[in-house]
A protein has these predicted regions:
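Extended alpha-helical interface modules used as scaffolds for assembling large macromolecular complexes
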Residues: 1-175
């Protein structure tokens, strides 16, 4: 699965609220050309919503897919995190996040996050779209920690890159 996600260059947030038609599901698993049906067939995605529209000549069906539950979402993120982001300070970052959850002290977590990002090889820091790259990494990292986080959240003022909901505070993160 991790090799397929890498092959198709997809990010975790690409699977949140994915819309597709029924015809997209009819692909044999042994000849994967689209990862969404594979994730659906293997249980990583489930149907969250269904809409149908009747036209003069056809019935248009749209399915909205998403993770079936938080455990599946977190497990996939943790696998991606460990497989793709092989840096030395991941344990320290996880510990800092747990402290952040308990004490609501974002400053310490941000310091550990900076150290974490500094551990990436130079070649990873020069990807074509740095903002998208770091957006995806931060989303995957926080999701692997079990965070209540959403990507590209629309608000009255525009679209927030990430929204992290804590027990007492909501953080809007712009990258």
């Amino acid at each position: 699965l991790l090799k397929l996600i890498n092959k198709f260059d997809l990010k975790m947030e690409d699977f949140e609220n994915t819309e597709c038609r029924a015809s997209r599901f009819n692909q044999p698993v042994e000849k994967v050309t689209d990862l969404v049906p594979f994730l659906f067939q293997s249980g990583y995605l489930t149907i969250k919503d269904y809409k149908s529209f009747i036209t003069d000549s056809d019935i248009m069906e749209t399915y909205t897919l998403g993770y079936p539950n938080g455990e599946v979402r977190t497990a996939l993120a943790d696998s991606l995190f460990r497989n793709y982001y092989k840096v030395n300070d991941s344990i320290a970052l996880r510990t800092a996040y747990m402290d952040f959850m308990q004490n609501d002290d974002i400053d310490v977590f941000i310091e550990h996050l900076k150290i974490f990002f500094d551990g990436f090889p130079f070649s990873m820091n020069n990807e074509k779209e740095n903002e998208l790259h770091y957006h995806s990494i931060l989303y995957t990292v926080l999701t692997s920690f079990g965070a209540d986080i959403s990507a590209n959240q629309e608000t009255a003022l525009g679209k927030a890159d990430l929204v992290l909901k804590m027990p007492k505070t909501i953080y809007v993160i712009e990258i």
